[in-house]
């Protein structure tokens, strides 16, 4: 069995290649990058306590972009150092997935750290490409949405974030269903037939909108609310009423001034904005590559479903369940490592037979 680790800036996700161990742990590196030590140490202890026998560890990351690091290069190297420090006592091989889709040892990172930056989406795409030759992979997560075209089994997406963010690429949408500032999606909202500009303050996030709409539960709200410091308990901070109050504040007012109906309307407009953004990306992919089938992953699958339906495209049923969907890059890198080791062993056996 193999372990996959996806180190993000906000969440660290883990999964075993058989899917028996799956978790997403909120670990905001920008608060203190040492938090990654604590998270991975708990993972290590959990593996020991449960007696799970790990043959190897595969790692992908996006956390290097966190502004607790001066540069992304520094971030990649620091994340590697932390992972290596924690797992060196397990006596298993730890390898890192690079932009070419190749597993390499930690020492190789010294040569070109950026070759290992933001590779989590690529692991997911590579695994899917082994099962589907012509498809668009959409992974809508807490912070971003990856839109990855696969044509004839070849991953057509650009390899760097800046290239995928290009206005003509539509491959990286920097919005997700939990952590995105509502002001980044809506510059104006409509209420009671009138149009209002929104405040650019961090008053509300997409998690608030989807909690109000019922698309996520309090348990799904795995990040801090914008005003978490104002509440005695997390339960209070992440109640539906608190979420509506934060949405109302986007218009510099209290909930009493716009009512629940007004807050609900803002939430609907947040969802419409995200769905429409994805519709634009999917339409571009369909026209550019003649693709009409979509595989969805991530906690924001409800956004993907609405966009696919609006375009009358076909949403395929993935081979993984909802638990694995939420941590797909971690599962993918574990599965890819398992496949690679199995192929290597088969090759060695074949050579011995000869």
Q: Where do the PLM segments sit?
A:
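Conserved Rossmann-like nucleotide-cofactor binding loop
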Residues: 10, 143
């Amino acid at each position: 069995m193999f372990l996959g680790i996806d180190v993000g800036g906000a969440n660290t996700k883990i999964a075993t290649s058989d899917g028996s161990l799956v978790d997403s742990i909120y670990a905001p590196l920008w608060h203190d990058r040492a938090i990654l030590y604590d998270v991975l140490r708990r993972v290590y202890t959990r593996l020991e306590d449960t007696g799970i026998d790990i043959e190897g560890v595969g790692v992908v990351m996006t956390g290097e972009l966190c502004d607790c690091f001066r540069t992304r290069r520094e971030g990649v190297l620091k994340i590697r150092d932390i992972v290596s420090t924690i797992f060196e006592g397990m006596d298993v091989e730890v390898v890192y997935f690079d932009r070419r889709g190749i597993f390499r040892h930690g020492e190789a990172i010294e040569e070109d750290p950026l070759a290992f930056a933001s590779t989590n989406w690529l692991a997911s795409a590579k695994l899917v490409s082994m099962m589907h030759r012509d498809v668009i992979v959409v992974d809508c997560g807490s912070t971003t949405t990856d839109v990855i075209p696969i044509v004839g089994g070849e991953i057509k997406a650009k390899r760097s974030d800046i290239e995928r963010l290009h206005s003509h690429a539509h491959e990286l949408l920097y919005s997700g269903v939990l952590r995105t500032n509502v002001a980044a999606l809506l510059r104006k909202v409509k209420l009671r037939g009138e149009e209002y500009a929104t405040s650019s303050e961090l008053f509300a996030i997409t998690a608030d909108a989807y909690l109000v709409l019922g698309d996520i539960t309090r348990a799904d709200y795995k990040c801090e609310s914008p005003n978490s410091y104002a509440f005695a308990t997390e339960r209070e901070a992440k109640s539906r009423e608190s979420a509506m109050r934060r949405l109302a504040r986007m218009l510099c007012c209290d909930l009493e001034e716009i009512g629940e109906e007004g807050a609900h309307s803002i939430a609907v407009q947040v969802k419409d904005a995200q769905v429409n953004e994805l519709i634009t990306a999917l339409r571009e992919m369909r026209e550019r590559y003649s693709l009409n089938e979509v595989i969805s992953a991530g906690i924001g699958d409800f956004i993907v479903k609405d966009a696919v339906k609006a375009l009358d495209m076909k949403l395929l049923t993935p081979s993984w369940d909802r638990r694995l969907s939420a941590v797909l890059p971690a599962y993918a890198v574990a599965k890819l490592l398992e496949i690679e080791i199995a192929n290597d062993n088969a090759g060695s056996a074949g050579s011995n037979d000869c």
